[in-house]
Regions:
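N-terminal active-site segment of His-dependent metallophosphoesterases
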Residues: 25-32, 41, 86-180, 460
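Short, ordered, surface-exposed loop/turn motifs in non-cytosolic proteins
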Residues: 31-34, 39-54
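Glycine-centered loop-to-beta-strand initiation motif
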Residues: 35, 59-73, 112, 421, ...
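Hydrophobic beta-strand segments
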Residues: 48-52, 77, 413-415
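Short, acidic Ser/Thr/Gly-rich low-complexity loop/linker segments typical of extracellular
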Residues: 54-68, 426-433
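Extended active-site neighborhood of metal-dependent phosphoesterases/phosphodiesterases
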Residues: 83-90, 95-102, 177-278, 297-318, ...
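Binuclear metal-dependent phosphoesterase catalytic core
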Residues: 334-407, 411-417, 448-479
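Aromatic sugar-binding surface patches on proteins
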Residues: 431-454
């Protein structure tokens, strides 16, 4: 309990005593749970994957399922919604795909009801938002007025052509569980189905997580999150894609945690993926990254084991936690998007610690292919870079410098002077010199998505041309008076 304050320690010991005493009577904790998965006409749906976080079952042709569940270890039974059915939701928030085990026990089982899709959703949009991390009324106002306002506009436009699915990648709040309802209310009512992932600041600091609590403890750190949003490890299917969300924060209480997936979680993931055809496109959502090259201290401890569990699939990992932007091509079939935070550097300014603007990611899925673009909350969705004129980026005074936050190895960053192509810009590691985040703990960090070129004095205007892996082009032009103009187009 090192690091826990006296109040938290006292509460922890009280819960431990209550769990051990149990009123002097042993409590039954293992039950055979059963039920059905049916459509809106009451017909059983066969082949649906059901799990309680430990054990798995597949519904029979009649839609029936059964699991033997230890309610001390498992808090939910959930289904992996099949692609042929709509994602269940309530006012835009994902719901209806899980049931608390206590309710299933009290009700003698549970019936999940799914609505059949009239047509397959092989093409859809996927919106990933990282770290809203609101801690007070001021943060909530900025979250609603900036990120949510932008999200509502973006989602409204996207939903006119395709279904939209969203995920918040953890740290919905900043240690104040009372703000969960504010977060939920802010994203409700949009024309999309919004899922959640738990982050380290979504745990109750006074308690350890369930896996570290005394057996049968009446309270644990993720209980408030469970009550509001459901399980922390779950999956679903849409179109030809399998989507998994997992908690990779091992929370010990008092703000202490490790970034990792437990052995039992990795076994759960392997079981979940065993029902998915090899070679499928898989999206994995988690809070902390696995493979960052800068800021690697925030990576999960057992990333190699996770990589092995994901082998055989084409995987895109979406994560947050770091408050900077970094793409990592882990392998030919594994790509990590550590996206910029919606809160930037904890609402201390308008940028993340790497200089990327506060924003979110929009991915377009077509069959088994995926493309993506980052959307800045306060600027054009097509703005993919920031550009500095010579003399305005400290330490590189003779250079034009560009920060290209969504850069990866298949992106080209080139420049022209006076309309003449000059080749590729030089990539370097440095600290963004733009509008810096303010406040303790929000300091800028080195990033490798910076580029520079040295123009010839009097050689005419300089144009930076960024071509992404999908052929989209963005331009930054430095005029003679040092003014910078940005715009986007196609290749």
């Amino acid at each position: 309990m090192k690091g826990m304050n006296m109040k938290a320690r006292g509460l922890f010991l009280l819960l431990a005593c209550l769990a051990l005493m149990g009123g002097g009577m042993p409590r039954q904790n293992v039950f055979r749970l059963s039920g059905m998965v049916v459509d809106t006409e009451g017909r059983g749906i066969g082949g649906v994957v059901v799990n309680d976080g430990v054990g798995f079952a597949l519904t029979g042709a009649d839609g029936r399922w059964a699991l033997v569940t230890d309610t001390f270890r498992s808090k939910f039974v959930s289904i992996s919604t099949p692609a042929g059915f709509r994602l269940p939701q309530d006012s835009g928030l994902a719901a209806g795909f899980f049931v608390p085990v206590g309710r299933a026990v009290a009700g003698g089982g549970w019936r999940f009801v799914l609505e059949r899709r009239p047509v397959a959703a092989d093409s859809f949009y996927y919106v990933a938002v990282s770290d809203p991390q609101v801690r007070n009324a001021s943060d909530v106002a900025r979250w609603r007025g900036e990120a949510v306002a932008s999200l509502r506009s973006t989602v409204a436009a996207l939903s006119r052509s395709r279904e939209v699915v969203g995920v918040a990648l953890g740290d919905l709040v900043f240690d104040d569980m009372g703000l969960f309802d504010d977060y939920a209310g802010s994203v409700a009512g949009m024309p999309m189905t919004m899922f959640q992932c738990i982050g380290n600041h979504d745990f109750d600091r006074r308690l350890p997580a369930l896996r570290h609590a005394p057996e049968g403890a009446p309270a644990y750190a993720e209980m408030a999150y469970h009550r509001r949003f459901g399980p922390t490890d779950y999956s679903f299917n849409i179109g030809r894609v399998h989507i998994v969300t997992m908690c990779n924060i091992d929370y010990r209480g008092g703000g202490r945690y490790a970034e990792l997936l437990s052995d039992s979680q990795l076994s759960w993931l392997e079981r979940d993926l065993s029902y998915v055809p090899r070679g499928s496109l898989v999206i994995l959502n988690m809070h902390a990254p696995g493979w960052n090259r800068e800021g690697a201290a925030a990576n999960i401890d057992n990333a190699p084991r996770l990589e092995r569990a994901l082998s055989g699939y084409r995987v895109h990992v979406f994560c947050g936690h770091t408050h900077f932007f970094q793409n990592v091509e882990v392998g030919d079939s594994l790509y990590q998007h550590n996206i910029g935070a919606a809160s930037g550097a904890w609402w201390s300014g308008d940028v993340n610690r790497c200089g990327a603007p506060n924003g979110y990611m929009v991915a377009a899925v077509d069959g088994d292919s995926i493309s993506w673009r980052y959307v800045a909350s306060d600027r054009s969705a097509d703005s993919r870079m920031r550009v500095w004129a010579p003399g305005t980026f400290a330490g590189h005074e003779g250079f034009v410098v560009a920060n290209v936050w969504d850069y990866d190895s298949r992106c080209r960053v080139e420049w022209m002077q006076g309309g003449r192509p000059m080749g590729g810009m030089e990539r370097f590691v440095g600290v963004d010199r733009g509008p810096s985040p303010r406040g303790a703990g929000a300091a800028a960090v080195p990033t490798s998505h910076l580029f520079r070129c040295r123009p010839r004095p009097g050689g005419g205007r300089v144009t930076v041309v960024v071509t992404d892996r999908f052929g989209g082009r963005s331009y930054g032009e430095v005029l003679a008076d040092g003014t910078v103009r940005l715009w986007s187009g196609r290749g």
